[in-house]
Amino acid sequence: MNKVLEEISKIGILPVVVLEDAKDAKPLAHALCAGGLPCAEVTFRTAAAKESIAIMRKEFPEMLVGAGTVLTVEQVDEALEAGAQFIISPGFDEDVVKHCIEKNVPVTPGTCTPSDVQKCYRLGLDVVKFFPAEAAGGLKMIKSISAPYTQMKFIPTGGINANNMKDYLEYDRILAIGGSWMVKGDIIKSGDFDKVEALTRQAVEKLREVR
């Protein structure tokens, strides 16, 4: 397994971040690191994503920072220019996956069916995103899908929160969970990064109960 993905596995929780303004990147990264989660998936849902990744990588070199919601090869290149260390997409796009492989950057495409996982398996991937996790059947579905793919690990994202996170993390085929409850948009917009840090600490405490 790729070293970056191994580090994400050790951390256990991947905060999924949507930043409307790059000025929030530095204080948000500080709050996550201080709370015990030195990693972030910065989604390409906004124009601030590329600059935000660059700021986090520069100001917090110890942090693992990747790009999420990557839909095109062009966005892969933008993310890598900013310093992204991994790529995550909501679904499987063969061009995106192959481009990441060529660039030697870890990529975890979104999956929610055996066919999706099979496509990733055939391209040599050993970690995939399961999205939208809760809406697509949750942990029960992951257990069913994972049975034929004994080497595949999953990063479930979507609908995961402080109340159900432990259920996912207890399953040994879960590499890490993706979540946004500690980095919700309204908290970031209000500038309450102390709350981000507090919610992050609480998440880490729950994580330590099972890992």
Task: Report residues per predicted region.
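Catalytic cores of alpha/beta
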Residues: 28, 72-82, 115-123, 146, ...
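Glycine-enriched alpha-helix->loop->beta-strand junction motifs that scaffold or abut catalytic
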Residues: 33-38, 59-62, 81-87, 102-108, ...
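Shared catalytic-loop signature of beta/alpha-barrel
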Residues: 140-155
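Catalytic beta/alpha-barrel core
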Residues: 16-18, 39-46, 63-71, 84-92, ...
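Glycine-rich phosphate-binding active-site loops on the catalytic face of alpha/beta enzymes
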Residues: 86, 90-96, 129-139, 173-195
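Glycine/Thr-rich beta-alpha phosphate-binding loop at enzyme active sites
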Residues: 37-42, 80-82, 103, 113, ...
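Glycine-rich beta-strand-to-loop/alpha-helix junction loops that act as flexible
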Residues: 67-68, 156-160, 177-180
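Conserved N-terminal beta1-alpha1 strand-loop-helix module at the mouth
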Residues: 1-82, 102, 162, 189-211
